[in-house]
Amino acid sequence: MSMWPRSRVRIPEQTVLVARAAFPNGSVAMSARDHLGEVFTDEQFAAAFGVRGAPAESPGALALVTALQFTENLTDRQAAQMVARAIDWKYALGLELTDPGFDASVLSKFRTRLVEHSLEEQVFTRMLTVLAGEGLIGAGGRQRTDSTHVISAVRDLNRLELAGESVRACLEALSVAAPDWLTEVIDVAEWAHRYGPRIDSWRLPTSQAKKDRLAQIYGTDAVALLRAAFAAEAPTWLAEISAVQTLRVMLVQNYLITTDSRGREVIRRRETDTDGLPPAKFRITSPYDTDTRWAAKGDDLFWNGYKVHLTETCDHDDEPDTTTSDDDASRPAPNLIVNVATTAATVPDVKATTSIHQQLHERGLLRRAARA
């Protein structure tokens, strides 16, 4: 997909007239355009696009839509609808009133493209630069940092589901990477019956004895598959496939290989009370996202995912708002988010403070900070 940078976009006259009539006191979107101008330009995102292919939607406009979307807590579909029907958004984007907007899928593709080209902080950093130029943020004053949970985009799995789904994910990867080799080392019909559908607790046995037996089967299959992949006669690159590595980690964390009194090999699942499990910060919870972790905050918040630490200015929180004038210059500066840091869900808030302060220092925004 190609990108042809737009020159500075002037707001169409008809859009200005209708927007001013509809919003005589303005709106967040209109204020952003009036006070901050065109915050984002297409040139800032040129590295994420090629010079050939179908023309892309303006990345500068998509960046502004993303910022407005976050401000109003909208889904992609809702944000795309706002571009098509909201007059104040058309004003902010410099669009004609008749502009139909774009499909909602464009926003997720835009975010993906930013991540793939390591431009994920470009939007936030650019916004901070503009706000600093307006004198709304800077060094000095007070800040506060607090964290909240981020739920991962994977299905929550119990230990039995995790074992079976890890084998299934590995089989899926190997069936694509080395289909001929895979048919030589497993009974395709039997394994397809066992691992064809996704492993779901709704389909699993209800009795504990049958669950224990199934856990042993999953462990035995995992060992057999890994031994085949790491065998001397197997292609060496098979062991480097991420799904194979994930299956190996799952096996080590959840199973034990021992021998019975007759010297026979026994593969059994680890028992929490007697065998122990790895600490939560090391224990994988899904074969499809090996960074997500189970965590708790307080007595009643449990989640599988990550933690995001938000730092905002709070210079005027202790001051009552006695402003009666409509003059923006007489109003105190708003509280603004100046740093976003994502960590593993198991990282305590206090452990993230040092790295957060370093990020603020690099941006020239380090203040007298305190945890909320």
List each model region and its residues.
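Basic, short loop/linker segments at the boundary and entry of helix-turn-helix/winged-helix-like folds
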Residues: 22-67, 71
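Acidic, metal-coordinating catalytic cores used for nucleic-acid/nucleotide bond scission
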Residues: 53-57, 87, 370-372
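DNA-recognition alpha helix
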Residues: 79-91
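Charged, often Cys/His-bearing segments associated with DNA-binding zinc-finger transcription factors
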Residues: 1-37
